[in-house]
Structure formats: C-alpha cells, structure tokens
Amino acid sequence: MGVTLFKEVSYTLSKLIDSIEMGEIGLPEIQRPFVWPNTKVRDLFDSMYRGFPVGYLLFWANGSGGGHRQIGTGTKQRVPQLLIVDGQQRLTSLFAVFKGIPVVREDFRAERIRIAFCPLTGRFEVTDAAILRDPEFIPDISEIWSEQSNIFELADAYIERLRRARPVTPQEQKAIQKAINSLDNLSSYPFTALEIASSATEEEVADV
C-alpha cells in the first residue's frame, strides 16, 4: 500500500455551516449546480431528525487557491481551504435552509427552499399554500435557526397559533416543545468527512 492520501474528520452540522459561511469550504469547478428537488431536501431533514446517517462527505484540500465556487451569493471572507467533491447537494440544501437563503438553479433562477415541520407528528413537508394555512405546521423551519429567533418564544407562538384553531392539551404542549427542541438540535448532527490531500491531482480526485 502506498501513501494514504486522505484523512477522516468529524464535524457537527453547525461547524460545517460556519465553515461554508466563512468561505473555508467551497465548490470546485468540476461540480454541478443545485439540482435536487425540494422533496429530497425534505427527506434529508426527515432522515437527520430521525437519527439516521445521511452519508459521508468528500473534501479535497485546496492547494491552488483557485478554480472554485462558493455556496450562496454573499462575499466570503477567505479562500476555501476545502473543496466539496461529494456532498454538494446535501450541504447546499442544509446551508440554504439553515440560513434562509435562496439556491441558484440550473437555469440561474434563485429559489428559496421552504420546508415545513409538524411538531406533533414529526413530519416534514415542502411548504405550499395548504401548509401555510395549516396551524399544525411550522411553515418555514429556517426561522428555528435564525439569529433573531428565540426557540422558546417560537414554540410559544406556535402553540398559541394552534390554540386559536383547537384546544391543546398539556401533554401536547410538552410534546411540541420537545419536538421543536429536537429540531433545533439538528445543528449538532454529526457528519464524517474524508479529506483528500492537496497533493492529489484533479484526475485522481475525479476517479474516487
């Protein structure tokens, strides 16, 4: 066996989000635009909420300082140290929903992905007109992780909205608060990344 060209690194989701926001993680030019349908984004959050694994990430240490794109449309603060080789769709989905920002589709159209959550059933849905009218759902989970949000106030506001539609039992109130707290805790969801050394060539990385 030759020299090992990768190492295994553990991340929390919040660390990944912060690294993308700071520009430490970017997209190499060989990657695709965002192509996932919103239902796949919904399913990703559902799997994470239920505690299932959602796959490894594959990063490539950026030795050149060029040939990359970054997630989102804002100006990043630094040259990416890591380029995403596998996991672009998952990380773009998570970053867009956590930060409440639009993704750029293949036709260069900006789209905000809105995912709804029902605390009493643990169900996720793509937000539509019917979901917006349904008091059982939080219509946009992005607000959970907004810097302006308070998780306790958000839970209270949801319960109050539900009470205007029907009675809420004390047991339901506890279940709602627990579910919203569990959703908030997705920021600590664990990911494992394999980081390929910068000495690997683009051809070698493409063959992985």
Segments (PLM) and residue ranges:
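Basic- and aromatic-enriched surface patches that contact anionic nucleotides/nucleic acids
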Residues: G2-V208
